[in-house]
Structure formats: C-alpha cells, structure tokens
C-alpha cells in the first residue's frame, strides 16, 4: 500500500522551488490564524494577474511584488517564477543570500519584501475573491 501511495504522489506536479520558498516566507510573517492560501485571489493583485488600482495596503503588497518580478524578468536568463534562491528566517525577519543584482538575490528580495509587507498589512475578509471585473478596472 505504501508503494501505491508513493506512486500516486509522483503524478502530482511539484511547485516551483521559489513558490515553496515564498509560501514559507509568507507563513513566517502572517498571523497564526491565517494560511498562505488566503492571500491568493485577494484584491486586484494577489494571485495570478492583476489590473486596476490596488484596493488596500495588502493588495498593494502584491502589486509591488508583481512589478518587482517584472523588473527581475529583465535580468538576463531570469525567470522569477522558477528561480531558486537561498534565504534564512530568523528573529522575525528574512535574510536573502547571494550577490546583489543577481537573479536569485533580486527574486529573493522581491519575495522577502512582499512577505514582510503581508505581515504588516491588515487582512480584510471582504477583499478575498472580489469581483475583479467590477472593482479592478
């Protein structure tokens, strides 16, 4: 039975490593009663895509993160969504490693800044799963 379970798990596509890193950073900075998944499909920018003006401070964190990834994508051979990087969670902060200006460091700094911003911003339940066609134009 263990083999069957492992074989079944092998068919689940893995998340890109940096997404796992970003999720870990978010979990480290947000209130205990929240999960990182509650930050997807929040406002106009948290989750895939984005348009219009951010609706609050938390949504602005995602807007800034999207733009940061856009800037990182201009670095030669840099794909922010799949770039792995090294970091450390310590004493309520996040430390990114690597040479300044490299793809890995820039992407880590994007994720670090967003995660810390999430931790500092109010989560408004009514801004989860909003009608983006209506509120994000």
Swiss-Prot record:
One of its GO terms (biological process) is phospholipid metabolic process. The active site is at residues 65, 111. It is found in: Secreted. InterPro entries: PLipase_A2, PLipase_A2_Asp_AS, PLipase_A2_dom, PLipase_A2_dom_sf, PLipase_A2_His_AS. GO terms for cellular component: extracellular region. It catalyses: a 1,2-diacyl-sn-glycero-3-phosphocholine + H2O = a 1-acyl-sn-glycero-3-phosphocholine + a fatty acid + H(+). It holds the Pfam family Phospholip_A2_1. This is Acidic phospholipase A2 beta-bungarotoxin A3 chain. It comes from Bungarus candidus.
């Amino acid at each position: 039975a263990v083999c069957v379970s492992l074989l079944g798990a092998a068919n689940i596509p893995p998340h890109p490593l940096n997404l796992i890193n970003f999720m870990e950073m978010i979990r480290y900075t947000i209130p205990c009663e929240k999960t990182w998944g509650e930050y997807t499909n929040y406002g106009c920018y948290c989750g895939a895509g984005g348009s219009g003006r951010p609706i609050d401070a938390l949504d602005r964190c995602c807007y800034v993160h999207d733009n940061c990834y856009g800037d990182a994508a201009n670095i030669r051979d840099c794909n922010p969504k799949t770039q792995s990087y090294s970091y450390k969670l310590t004493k309520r902060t996040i430390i990114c490693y690597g040479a300044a200006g490299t793809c890995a460091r820039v992407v880590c700094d994007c994720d670090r800044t967003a995660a810390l911003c999430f931790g500092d911003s109010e989560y408004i339940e009514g801004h989860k799963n909003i009608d983006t066609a209506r509120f994000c134009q």
